[in-house]
Amino acid sequence: MITLIATLKVKDGSLDEAIRILKEIVPQVKASEPGCLEYIPHTVRGDDKTIIFYEKYSDKDALKLHSANLMKNMEKLFPLLEPGMDIKTCFEIIR
């Protein structure tokens, strides 16, 4: 099991549009990537620029498939984002 925590920053005034786009993207990812077990974007209270993704993949191959599809799935969102993402790869200790 592989978990990613990805933090993205949207440009000023772009959060509502980013959320609208994510409501399209997330179901597509879940439908087309069976090894993607969780793909949940979050906002942060009091911060209108941050989106945090909680992502869980069954194995390395599932993560590779997601990475290969990332540009296509996120092409509408990328213009709304500030440069750079903070991505942390996590591994479960206890379940």
Regions found by a protein language model. Give the residues of each.
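An amphipathic, aromatic/His-enriched active-site/gating alpha helix that lines ligand/cofactor pockets
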Residues: 25, 31-32, 36-37, 56-89
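Absolute protein N-terminus
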Residues: 1-2, 95
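A short acidic, often aromatic-flanked loop/helix-cap motif at beta-alpha or helix-coil junctions
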Residues: 47, 93-95
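Short, well-ordered beta-strand segments in beta-rich or mixed alpha/beta enzyme
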Residues: 2-9, 38-67
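Short, surface-exposed ligand-recognition loops at beta-strand->loop->(often short) alpha-helix junctions
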Residues: 10-17
